[in-house]
Design a protein with these regions (language model features):
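Sequence context surrounding c-type heme c attachment/ligation sites in exported
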Residues: 28, 32-60, 84-180
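Polar low-complexity intrinsically disordered regions enriched in Ser/Thr and small residues
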Residues: 6, 41-42, 71
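Sec/Tat signal peptide C-region and signal peptidase I cleavage site
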Residues: 21-28
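Positively charged n-region of N-terminal signal peptides that target proteins for export
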Residues: 1-8
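N-terminal post-signal-peptidase region of extra-cytosolic proteins
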Residues: 65-83, 104-107
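Short hydrophobic transmembrane-like helices used for membrane targeting/insertion
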Residues: 8-9, 26
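Bacterial N-terminal signal peptides
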Residues: 10-21
Length: 180
């Protein structure tokens, strides 16, 4: 093989390597680029993974951890909503929901998180969401097989209002800030 042929082979291998690496990088989903059909972007909750714990809950099919951004945590600590005041603008809640499974390691019966099911979010922004008490709602479903998120099929910023209207007196928030 002469020098020119080796150069062509090397260039071809390099181009193929760049294509493969680029394809892998592109296939990794950036969840923060997602938006609900109503326009609420996942990026509104960027950093939710590091928010403080508000509470936990369990339904028959989900284990849930409710997290809050610094704005809502400060509001809870000041007595909201128990003092009759509404949560301030910019308050945000993230509910991380897993499918449960029985622990095979614990010496007692306990449900532990299995696969992530979905993420549910609330955001206080009275200008953007005046028709729902100032709160916007979003849910993104997680597909463990592809490790990707998709906007929930209900997909509108008002999808959570139907349930949360039951706690209007607590500014539409179900979970109290639990004692630590």
């Amino acid at each position: 093989m002469n020098g020119k042929s080796m150069l062509i082979v090397a260039a071809t291998v390099f181009v193929l390597a760049v294509v493969v690496v680029s394809s892998v990088a592109i296939s990794a989903q950036d969840k923060y680029t997602l938006k609900l059909p109503g326009g609420v972007p996942f990026s509104d909750w960027k950093g939710y993974e590091d928010w403080r714990l508000i509470s936990t809950s369990k339904t028959d099919d989900r284990l849930k951890v409710i997290l809050g951004n610094p704005t809502i945590i400060a509001a809870f600590k000041s007595g909201i909503p128990g003092n009759g005041k509404p949560f301030p603008e910019g308050s945000k809640i993230a509910k991380v929901q897993w499918k449960p499974k029985k622990s095979t390691e614990a010496p007692f019966v306990v449900d532990v998180p299995d696969t992530l099911a979905d993420l549910f979010f609330m955001e206080k922004d009275s200008k953007r969401f005046p028709e729902t008490g100032g709160w916007g709602y979003a849910q993104f479903d997680y597909d463990p097989a592809s490790a990707t998120y998709t906007p929930d099929k209900a997909g509108t910023p008002t999808c959570g209002q139907v349930c949360h209207v039951k706690v209007k007196a607590k500014d539409y928030v179900f979970h109290p800030y639990q004692t630590r």
